[in-house]
A protein has these predicted regions:
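Glycine-rich short-loop/terminal segments
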Residues: 1-43
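Conserved NAD+-utilizing ADP-ribose enzyme module
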Residues: 2-8, 36-43, 51-162
Length: 162
């Protein structure tokens, strides 16, 4: 365990976009998709540490209206998720990645055989000579995150009151 990894007892919160990550009240795997951005592929799924001292301030700076949906997930449950692909495991690690203005910031990192999966995963899948089935595996492991996340869906206003 490296110094930035979070302990299994911690919770993290993922704020989700109701337009692209929820359909008819159901959380979609897209809520946990790594995206390709103009400045490069995402390396982790953005979350906030629920028990961090700055959590309420940080999350309210992100959602000033306090009405966005969010899900609370236990780090221990996240890190128990595993999926085997081509004799290598896909696993999650949750690490603190604080910034100057958002100190409760953390990320859910996806690894394949010890390599961080970035964006659509081409970087890791090419290292292991894994082809077209790779997208299927990424969706399958994201569905496991959905199973954890859908247990505790709430709103920013509700979670800040807790």
């Amino acid at each position: 365990m490296d110094a930035n990894e979070l302990y299994a007892i911690e919770n993290v919160v993922r704020v989700v976009s109701p337009q692209t990550m929820i359909n008819e009240g159901e959380l979609l795997p897209a809520a946990f998709k790594l995206r390709e951005r103009a400045d490069g592929p995402e390396q982790y799924i953005s979350v906030s540490r629920q028990y961090a001292e700055s959590f309420s301030k940080d999350i309210l700076s992100f959602d000033k209206q306090r009405n966005l949906p969010c899900c609370i997930m236990n780090v221990g449950e996240i890190t128990k998720i595993e999926l085997e692909i081509a004799d290598n495991q896909i696993i999650y690690k949750v690490k603190a990645v604080p910034t100057e203005n958002y100190t409760s910031y953390a990320g859910i990192f996806t690894y394949l055989g010890g390599i961080i999966i970035e964006g659509d995963g081409k970087n890791a899948f090419s290292s292991f000579n894994i082809g077209s089935e790779s997208k299927f595996h990424l969706i399958a492991i994201r569905r496991r995150l959905v199973e954890i996340a859908k247990k505790r869906i709430t709103t920013v206003s509700q979670i800040v009151k807790q």
